[in-house]
Amino acid sequence: SAKRIFRLDLNDPTKSDRWNFIPKCRNDPAFACQVAGMMIGIESRRKTNADPFWGDAEQIALTAILLHIAEVYREKAIPAFAADFLISLGEDGKDAFAKAMENSPSLYAKQAYLAFRQAPIQTRGSILIGLYNKLRPFTLAPARMVTMPPMAEEIEAGCRNIDFSNLRKPGTAIYLV
């Protein structure tokens, strides 16, 4: 039986526990890569005959972004920041993504970007558009709310943070409402 039971409620986020996995990406490229795969649906991608290039390129780009925002925003970083980051790049013809990643305070973000840079220049914009499309659900108000740290009054009311590292421990259950 479950010993640690959590509730993620996207219908009524005020009744939800919180789950923010972005701060744990800081200085952990392997974890950031796993989170990137989870966020863009790597499991469903593996079950298709589609060209793996696009998904792999999106995953390495998102890995770089997660490492960057986890370093810049630390504990305040939430999944929506990844999409916000892409939108903030605007229409800079001189490749704003490249500038941001090359100047990132995260060495690991820079390394992930170097891998992304292996994609042909002509396809990089399309990769980032596809990535934003997959990240957009994280920008919706309910998703933002359930990934933000709880306020003091919410903690007093019983709201808890879900520790990502507990997910593989027996006895942990998360109910998605």
Task: Pin down the residues of each PLM region.
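P-loop NTPase motor domains
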Residues: 1-177
